[in-house]
């Protein structure tokens, strides 16, 4: 679960700025740091204590918590329980992609919290659209 509310605000701003020219989606993938797996201190500090979902319904419930907690404005899609999207896009624990209308990956951040850089993503979007940053 994306936990940084400042980053979520920025993602919403970027999507709002370009929503007339492209579609934006967030895909909820497997939980990176579940309580019944590899829990990390910053999740405990932020009161993010979730078990890994075992059904698509449980995954949907956690995704809804993420949307509400972070005020995510873009549609939230769910990865399936085989983690197909995560596997195809090496998305765990979090990652930003820019995929053009032909399905070609035009930009991707480095996987993980240290590579999750909304400004780099925003710059790639403006470059692809040919608009000033």
Predicted segments — roles?
Residues 1-133:
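Chalcogenol-based redox active-site neighborhoods
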């Amino acid at each position: 679960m994306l936990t940084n509310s400042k980053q979520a605000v920025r993602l919403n701003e970027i999507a709002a700025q370009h929503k007339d020219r492209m579609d934006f989606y967030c895909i909820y993938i497997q939980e990176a740091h579940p309580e019944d797996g590899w829990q990390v201190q910053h999740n405990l500090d932020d009161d993010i204590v979730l078990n890994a979902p075992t059904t698509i319904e449980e995954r949907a419930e956690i995704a809804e918590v993420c949307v509400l907690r972070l005020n995510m404005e873009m549609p939230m899609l769910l990865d399936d329980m085989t983690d197909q999207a995560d596997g195809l896009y090496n998305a765990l624990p979090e990652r930003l992609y820019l995929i053009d209308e032909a399905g070609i990956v035009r930009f991707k951040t480095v996987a993980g919290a240290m590579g999750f850089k909304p400004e780099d993503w925003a710059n790639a979007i403006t470059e692809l659209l040919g608009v000033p940053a």
